[in-house]
Amino acid sequence: MKKSVIIAIIVVVAACVVLFSLFGHCNKGPQVSEHRVDTIMTDNLVILIPRYDSIDFLGTNITPEADSPHDNIIYVSAASFTLKYLDTFSHSNIIGTHVCSGELHKLSGSKLLSGAFVYYNGQYKFLDKDYMSEMERAAQCGGCGFTQQLILYKGAKVKTRTKDNMNVQFRALCNLHDTTLCIVQTRGSMPFGQFKQSLLNAGITDALYLDMGAWDYGWYRDSIGTPHHIGTSRHGNYTNWLVFYK
């Protein structure tokens, strides 16, 4: 075989590898040796750090159960806002554009929505209002994404529609020290302004609100697989779940 032919074959194979990495189903992240959720407690926050292989955003009103012996979920909770209490599921009942398992749903949002989160190609990103191209990219790559109220972005507070004096329990998807994806929840009710400052004090650089109130239910697994429940509002009217998989 001529040398030029061999070189051409190598170039074609390399191009195929690059194209697959760019446009194939690439939702898997770096594989970890031990799948669990680590917990860090501060005076007023609970920081949950999933050791995961992949992430997805599921559109369904079926609550993922924590007692399945073959469950590959290590963390799950609601993420986007839900429009109405409905007994049947509809993507149109999820407020804002989202990507579920590589499927893009362009929907109208709310004035509360000021940012987004995407996960594809094994990497995550927090985004401000210019997120549509990244949503489309996540869909092309078999990834996921959702829109929500941005609380912190690149180490700075974001002006929010939610008032700083609103005093309830809060939860957010966060970027710790700009390197570690985590979920942060208050250890009880506190003013929203205090929550923002507490996130900054804990080293959070980016934070996207996660729905709470009547949609606060979720759970996570510790290092030996024991599920721990968070939130109490367990019902059949949920529309979406942020899921970390092992």
Where are these regions (language model features)?
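Gly/Ser/Thr/Pro-rich low-complexity, intrinsically disordered segments
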Residues: K2-K246
